[in-house]
Regions:
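Low-complexity, glycine/serine/proline-rich disordered segments
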Residues: 1-116, 228-253
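Active-site or metal-binding loop neighborhoods of secreted/extracellular toxin and effector enzymes
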Residues: 2-27, 161-253
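Soluble non-cytosolic domains of exported or imported proteins
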Residues: 71, 130-135, 139
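Active-site scaffold of zinc-dependent metalloenzymes
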Residues: 103-134, 150
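Active-site recognition of the HExxH zinc-binding catalytic motif
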Residues: 138-151
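Extracellular C-terminal loop/segment signatures of secreted glycoproteins
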Residues: 156-159
């Protein structure tokens, strides 16, 4: 089973002040405040003025995609640019990580200290090696939204945060180590339910207009819809690993 974390899952608990809160002293249930291991990107609080940080050395295709992400013609690109690419006090690092199994990406570090927000996204090295460019792109955008939500919960009063973002239902899964992780699914009748999928779908089409709307939607739904159809699951499986030669997107050179 492919696991791209539901993007509204910020790692915060249900009580005020969790997940790198403005007070800077608490961690969410994902232990987001753990020691920063970004390597060449520097330690926590040392990445000021770097904004969107490329720590993907050895994965040129992913590096090229990351360069394009803030400049594509879609809503998420504009949000990424406005949040991280124009503010030297809000920084995001993308880095590759081995041994992530079925997890495509995860927000592994978050810190809000002295008015500076730093966050790190770990991306599955196997996905960066074998997935189509479209799959890598939507995974990066998906995880960016996790980071964006963490930024919002770090800087907004909790009641404003909960009013701004959709209500969700909670469920539990086990990670590759057998640890219980809480995740969240959108309430189906929520009026904004479709807009999140639409934004991710449009980001794929803006990157590759040849991809059909229904195909892009299948990629966008992965990790947003708790249970997707068998056909959509197969599409994601094929795009995640080009070695099966059943993909429709662009293979990395």
């Amino acid at each position: 089973h492919i696991n791209r974390r539901p993007w509204w899952d910020t790692g915060k608990q249900s009580s005020k002040g969790d997940d790198a809160s403005a007070g800077g002293g608490k961690c969410g249930e994902y232990n987001d405040c753990k020691k920063d291991d970004r390597g060449g990107s520097g330690g926590g609080g040392e990445s000021q003025n770097k904004k969107i940080i490329d720590s993907l050395k050895g994965y040129k295709c992913a590096q090229d995609i990351l360069k394009q992400m803030p400049n594509l013609n879609n809503d998420l690109a504009r949000l990424l640019k406005d949040t991280f690419d124009t503010n030297d006090k809000v920084n995001i690092t993308f880095k590759a990580k081995e041994g992530m199994g079925s997890v495509d990406g995860i927000k592994s570090f978050t810190e809000y200290k002295n008015g500076v927000f730093n966050t790190t996204i770990d991306l599955n090295a196997d996905v960066l090696k074998y997935a189509t460019q479209e799959y890598i792109l939507v995974t990066m955008y998906h995880e960016f939204i996790h980071a964006y939500l963490s930024y919002q919960v770090s800087t907004l009063p909790y009641d404003q945060y909960t009013a701004k973002f959709p209500k969700v239902s909670e469920y539990e899964v086990k990670d590759s180590n057998g640890n219980i992780i809480k995740k969240y699914a959108l309430i189906k009748d929520h009026k904004n339910y479709g807009s999140f999928i639409e934004s991710l779908k449009n980001s794929i089409i803006s990157f590759n207009p040849v991809i059909t709307s229904s195909y892009a939607e299948a990629l966008a739904k992965n990790g947003i819809i708790k249970r997707i159809t068998e056909n959509k699951s197969k599409i994601n499986k094929n795009e995640r690993d080009t070695r099966n030669n059943e993909y429709k997107g662009k293979k990395c050179p």
